[in-house]
Amino acid sequence: TGIGIWKSINQSYNPKTDLEAIRLALTPGITGTTRQEGGTDRNAGAGLFFIKSIASVNSDFFVIYSGKAMYKLLKRKGKKIKLHVDPFEDRHSKKGDLPSWEGTVVGIDLSLDTTQEFSLLLKLLNETLNEAIKERKKARYKKPQFT
């Protein structure tokens, strides 16, 4: 087993629950290695977001379980493809009171056929990641900072 998402994310953020840590881990540009928006050259904080987004667009299976929490992506309704920065805006189910698991389990069933939808997905992933980082930077600099 590993250290789990909460312990990893807690190195740079302060999630109160395992479910909050999973939410952060699925958010583009957030990584446990730094609070720097967009991560670093070695860790951009986009991997789980990309995998979840591919599963969402293709209506594939995606579930993540860490600590006492689980997040499961549900098949999207309708044909319109939209990526959400906040994973809780996707159709999903979640639980925060499960038996504790010290590491992290990710279950995925992905179809990676190169289709028009997949090409669109790559474009949307890039746009969504860049927009999420830009919005968080803007929000951060609006806060008063006192020393």
Question: What are these language model-derived features?
Answer:
Residues 1-4:
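Glycine-rich acidic phosphate-binding loop
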Residues 8-9:
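Structured extramembrane domains adjacent to transmembrane segments
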Residues 12-19, 23-42, 53-147:
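Flexible, glycine-/charge-rich segments associated with ATP-binding catalytic modules
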